[in-house]
Amino acid sequence: MANRQKMSKTRDKKPDWQERVVQIRRVSKVVKGGKKLSFRAIVVIGNERGQVGVGIGKASDVINAVKKAAADGKKHVVEVPLTRSNSIPHPIDGIGGAARVIMRPSAEGTGVIAGGAVRTVLELAGVRNILAKQLGSNNPLNNARAAMNALSRLKTFSQFAKDRGVIAE
């Protein structure tokens, strides 16, 4: 029984999934005896083929915080529709806290023109040609959440046609 559980755990972790740490921050909690220090990690996980997730983890040491964040990221994976030129199908913007991210599709050969946490999210989602701008807050967590909010609301041409009751050719 224990051997089967080990095998299923190794099968879940596919080699094509990548994780990148966006931020590690030391945080403290004031308790009766003084300050209790812990670490908060923000990790982006993706397979570069249209699936990406952002996770947050807190622990008393950095390694466990990153592990928890990666596990949290796997729980919050979203599917991103990509075009033939590895861009997004249409312009969109997303909001996370006080951060706002505007994304626009771009032509082949443009590359990922974005900064900070948004760039990491887009690269691990598999987007190769895009223009993105961060507005408002420059907090990496809120910018990553804003990017995920935008990517989760993307639709393909056929999905728009289906929603409107039009037959797509």
Curated annotation (Swiss-Prot):
Keywords annotated in UniProt: Cyanelle, Plastid, Ribonucleoprotein, Ribosomal protein, RNA-binding, rRNA-binding
List the GO molecular function terms. rRNA binding; structural constituent of ribosome
In the UniProt record, does the keyword Zinc occur?
Answer: no
Q: Kindly list the places in or outside the cell where this protein is found, as annotated in its UniProt entry.
A: Plastid, Cyanelle
A Pfam match:
Ribosomal_S5
Q: Does the keyword DNA-binding apply?
A: no
Q: Sorted alphabetically, which PANTHER family does this protein's record hold?
A: MITOCHONDRIAL RIBOSOMAL PROTEIN S5
* Domain characteristics, as noted in the entry: The N-terminal domain interacts with the head of the 30S subunit; the C-terminal domain interacts with the body and contacts protein S4. The interaction surface between S4 and S5 is involved in control of translational fidelity.
Q: How does it assemble?
A: Part of the 30S ribosomal subunit. Contacts protein S4.
Protein family: Belongs to the universal ribosomal protein uS5 family.
- Entries under HAMAP family matching the protein: Ribosomal_uS5_B
Role according to the record: With S4 and S12 plays an important role in translational accuracy.
Its protein name is Small ribosomal subunit protein uS5c
List the taxonomic lineage.
Eukaryota, Glaucocystophyceae, Cyanophoraceae, Cyanophora
